[in-house]
Amino acid sequence: MAQRRLRLIIGITGASGVVYGVRLLQVLREAEVETHLVISRAGQMTLAQEEPQLKLAELHALASRVYSDQDIGAAISSGSFKTAGMIVAPCSVQTLSAIATGVTTNLVSRAADVILKERRKLVLMLRETPLHLGHIRSMAEVTEMGAIVYPPVPAFYPRPAAVDEMVDHTIGRVLDLFDIETGLVSRWQGMKEKSATRPREPAEDEDAAAFTQPGQRNPRGPRIS
Protein backbone atom coordinates (compact mmCIF):
# COMPACT_ATOMS: atom_id res chain seq x y z
CA MET A 1 0.00 0.00 0.00
CA ALA A 2 1.36 3.44 -0.95
CA GLN A 3 2.22 5.70 1.97
CA ARG A 4 -0.27 8.53 2.37
CA ARG A 5 0.99 12.11 2.39
CA LEU A 6 1.05 13.95 5.70
CA ARG A 7 -2.32 15.64 6.16
CA LEU A 8 -2.96 18.74 8.29
CA ILE A 9 -6.01 20.88 9.01
CA ILE A 10 -5.37 24.62 8.92
CA GLY A 11 -7.80 27.00 10.62
CA ILE A 12 -7.69 30.77 10.15
CA THR A 13 -9.75 32.95 12.50
CA GLY A 14 -10.40 36.65 12.93
CA ALA A 15 -7.46 37.52 15.18
CA SER A 16 -4.83 39.88 13.84
CA GLY A 17 -1.89 38.09 12.24
CA VAL A 18 -3.49 36.40 9.24
CA VAL A 19 -0.03 36.45 7.66
CA TYR A 20 0.80 33.41 9.81
CA GLY A 21 -1.99 31.40 8.20
CA VAL A 22 -1.05 32.53 4.70
CA ARG A 23 2.63 31.76 5.12
CA LEU A 24 1.85 28.44 6.78
CA LEU A 25 -0.14 27.34 3.73
CA GLN A 26 2.65 28.46 1.39
CA VAL A 27 5.30 26.54 3.31
CA LEU A 28 3.19 23.39 3.60
CA ARG A 29 2.47 23.48 -0.11
CA GLU A 30 6.20 23.63 -0.83
CA ALA A 31 6.69 20.71 1.58
CA GLU A 32 4.00 18.72 -0.28
CA VAL A 33 1.84 18.41 2.83
CA GLU A 34 -1.88 17.88 2.19
CA THR A 35 -3.76 20.79 3.74
CA HIS A 36 -7.45 21.13 4.61
CA LEU A 37 -8.33 24.79 5.11
CA VAL A 38 -11.23 26.38 6.92
CA ILE A 39 -11.33 30.15 7.42
CA SER A 40 -13.97 31.77 9.59
CA ARG A 41 -16.02 34.73 8.41
CA ALA A 42 -14.11 36.96 10.80
CA GLY A 43 -10.90 35.52 9.35
CA GLN A 44 -12.02 36.56 5.88
CA MET A 45 -12.57 40.10 7.15
CA THR A 46 -9.10 40.18 8.70
CA LEU A 47 -7.59 38.86 5.46
CA ALA A 48 -9.18 41.73 3.51
CA GLN A 49 -7.90 44.24 6.09
CA GLU A 50 -4.34 43.00 6.61
CA GLU A 51 -3.56 41.40 3.23
CA PRO A 52 -5.65 43.43 0.73
CA GLN A 53 -3.46 42.36 -2.19
CA LEU A 54 -4.34 38.69 -1.60
CA LYS A 55 -7.75 37.61 -2.85
CA LEU A 56 -9.70 34.96 -0.98
CA ALA A 57 -9.61 32.71 -4.06
CA GLU A 58 -5.81 32.98 -4.10
CA LEU A 59 -5.67 31.92 -0.46
CA HIS A 60 -7.95 28.98 -1.21
CA ALA A 61 -5.65 27.95 -4.06
CA LEU A 62 -2.83 27.39 -1.56
CA ALA A 63 -4.76 24.57 0.14
CA SER A 64 -5.46 21.04 -1.04
CA ARG A 65 -9.10 21.28 0.10
CA VAL A 66 -11.22 24.17 1.37
CA TYR A 67 -14.34 24.09 3.56
CA SER A 68 -16.94 26.66 4.58
CA ASP A 69 -16.83 27.46 8.28
CA GLN A 70 -20.55 26.58 8.40
CA ASP A 71 -20.08 23.14 6.83
CA ILE A 72 -20.49 21.15 10.04
CA GLY A 73 -20.88 17.96 8.01
CA ALA A 74 -17.45 18.32 6.39
CA ALA A 75 -14.94 15.48 6.40
CA ILE A 76 -12.76 17.23 8.98
CA SER A 77 -15.67 17.28 11.45
CA SER A 78 -15.32 13.53 11.95
CA GLY A 79 -12.66 11.64 13.87
CA SER A 80 -12.69 8.91 11.23
CA PHE A 81 -11.04 11.38 8.84
CA LYS A 82 -7.41 10.75 9.75
CA THR A 83 -4.99 13.65 10.00
CA ALA A 84 -1.70 14.40 11.73
CA GLY A 85 -3.36 17.27 13.56
CA MET A 86 -4.47 20.87 13.22
CA ILE A 87 -2.96 24.34 13.43
CA VAL A 88 -5.10 27.42 14.05
CA ALA A 89 -3.14 30.39 12.75
CA PRO A 90 -3.97 32.90 14.01
CA CYS A 91 -6.24 31.77 16.83
CA SER A 92 -8.71 34.28 18.27
CA VAL A 93 -9.74 34.30 21.92
CA GLN A 94 -13.30 33.46 20.84
CA THR A 95 -12.04 30.30 19.12
CA LEU A 96 -9.86 29.47 22.13
CA SER A 97 -12.87 29.83 24.43
CA ALA A 98 -15.07 27.65 22.21
CA ILE A 99 -12.44 24.91 22.19
CA ALA A 100 -11.94 25.18 25.96
CA THR A 101 -15.65 24.74 26.68
CA GLY A 102 -16.37 22.18 23.96
CA VAL A 103 -19.29 24.32 22.77
CA THR A 104 -18.30 24.52 19.12
CA THR A 105 -19.70 27.38 17.04
CA ASN A 106 -18.30 26.73 13.56
CA LEU A 107 -16.17 24.24 11.65
CA VAL A 108 -12.90 25.67 13.00
CA SER A 109 -13.80 24.94 16.63
CA ARG A 110 -15.58 21.69 15.70
CA ALA A 111 -12.52 20.37 13.84
CA ALA A 112 -10.30 21.38 16.77
CA ASP A 113 -12.64 19.57 19.17
CA VAL A 114 -12.37 16.43 17.03
CA ILE A 115 -8.57 16.65 17.03
CA LEU A 116 -8.56 16.74 20.83
CA LYS A 117 -10.98 13.85 21.29
CA GLU A 118 -8.92 11.74 18.88
CA ARG A 119 -5.76 12.62 20.86
CA ARG A 120 -4.08 14.24 17.87
CA LYS A 121 -1.89 17.32 17.90
CA LEU A 122 -3.62 20.70 18.08
CA VAL A 123 -1.55 23.90 17.94
CA LEU A 124 -3.25 27.22 18.68
CA MET A 125 -1.32 30.32 17.61
CA LEU A 126 -3.14 32.61 20.02
CA ARG A 127 -3.00 36.28 19.05
CA GLU A 128 -4.18 38.40 21.95
CA THR A 129 -2.60 40.74 24.48
CA PRO A 130 -2.92 41.69 27.27
CA LEU A 131 -4.69 38.68 28.76
CA HIS A 132 -7.25 38.66 31.55
CA LEU A 133 -7.83 35.76 33.92
CA GLY A 134 -10.54 34.22 31.74
CA HIS A 135 -8.13 34.01 28.79
CA ILE A 136 -5.45 32.42 30.95
CA ARG A 137 -7.90 29.88 32.36
CA SER A 138 -9.00 28.96 28.83
CA MET A 139 -5.36 28.50 27.86
CA ALA A 140 -4.85 26.23 30.87
CA GLU A 141 -7.98 24.22 30.06
CA VAL A 142 -7.03 23.51 26.43
CA THR A 143 -3.50 22.64 27.55
CA GLU A 144 -4.90 20.13 30.03
CA MET A 145 -6.93 18.65 27.16
CA GLY A 146 -3.76 18.16 25.15
CA ALA A 147 -3.55 21.25 22.95
CA ILE A 148 -0.38 23.30 22.52
CA VAL A 149 -0.85 27.05 22.95
CA TYR A 150 1.76 28.72 20.77
CA PRO A 151 1.56 32.53 20.85
CA PRO A 152 3.54 33.76 17.83
CA VAL A 153 6.17 35.56 19.89
CA PRO A 154 9.10 36.45 17.62
CA ALA A 155 12.62 35.25 18.38
CA PHE A 156 15.34 37.88 18.30
CA TYR A 157 18.46 35.76 18.69
CA PRO A 158 18.57 35.18 14.88
CA ARG A 159 18.64 39.01 14.58
CA PRO A 160 15.85 39.24 11.98
CA ALA A 161 16.15 42.09 9.51
CA ALA A 162 12.49 42.11 8.44
CA VAL A 163 9.03 41.09 9.60
CA ASP A 164 9.00 38.30 6.99
CA GLU A 165 12.00 36.70 8.70
CA MET A 166 10.21 36.79 12.07
CA VAL A 167 7.13 35.18 10.54
CA ASP A 168 9.18 32.48 8.80
CA HIS A 169 11.07 31.58 11.97
CA THR A 170 7.83 31.27 13.93
CA ILE A 171 6.19 29.12 11.23
CA GLY A 172 9.28 26.92 11.15
CA ARG A 173 9.14 26.42 14.92
CA VAL A 174 5.44 25.55 14.80
CA LEU A 175 6.07 22.94 12.11
CA ASP A 176 8.92 21.54 14.22
CA LEU A 177 6.12 20.29 16.48
CA PHE A 178 5.01 18.04 13.61
CA ASP A 179 8.57 17.04 12.68
CA ILE A 180 8.30 18.95 9.40
CA GLU A 181 11.69 20.37 8.44
CA THR A 182 11.36 23.63 6.55
CA GLY A 183 14.81 25.18 6.64
CA LEU A 184 13.23 28.35 8.05
CA VAL A 185 14.58 28.07 11.58
CA SER A 186 17.90 29.49 12.70
CA ARG A 187 18.87 26.80 15.20
CA TRP A 188 20.35 27.99 18.48
CA GLN A 189 24.01 26.98 18.69
CA GLY A 190 24.75 28.36 22.12
CA MET A 191 25.87 31.76 23.32
CA LYS A 192 28.78 33.12 21.35
CA GLU A 193 31.74 34.04 23.53
CA LYS A 194 33.13 37.51 23.11
CA SER A 195 36.73 38.37 23.75
CA ALA A 196 37.12 39.87 27.19
CA THR A 197 38.17 43.50 26.93
CA ARG A 198 38.66 45.98 29.71
CA PRO A 199 36.04 48.73 29.56
CA ARG A 200 37.40 52.15 28.68
CA GLU A 201 37.48 54.57 31.59
CA PRO A 202 35.47 57.73 30.78
CA ALA A 203 37.30 61.04 30.73
CA GLU A 204 36.57 63.60 33.43
CA ASP A 205 34.59 65.82 31.06
CA GLU A 206 32.43 62.83 30.10
CA ASP A 207 31.67 62.17 33.77
CA ALA A 208 30.62 65.75 34.20
CA ALA A 209 28.42 65.65 31.11
CA ALA A 210 26.60 62.60 32.40
CA PHE A 211 25.12 64.57 35.30
CA THR A 212 22.87 67.43 34.24
CA GLN A 213 20.25 69.45 36.00
CA PRO A 214 16.52 69.22 35.12
CA GLY A 215 15.80 71.30 32.02
CA GLN A 216 19.36 71.01 30.70
CA ARG A 217 20.28 68.96 27.63
CA ASN A 218 22.45 65.94 28.30
CA PRO A 219 24.94 65.59 25.41
CA ARG A 220 24.94 61.81 25.97
CA GLY A 221 21.20 61.29 26.08
CA PRO A 222 17.71 62.76 25.73
CA ARG A 223 16.59 65.99 27.36
CA ILE A 224 15.85 65.62 31.08
CA SER A 225 12.60 67.22 32.22
Q: What are the roles of these predicted feature ranges?
A:
Residues 1-123, 129-225:
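A cross-family phosphate/adenosyl-ligand binding-site feature
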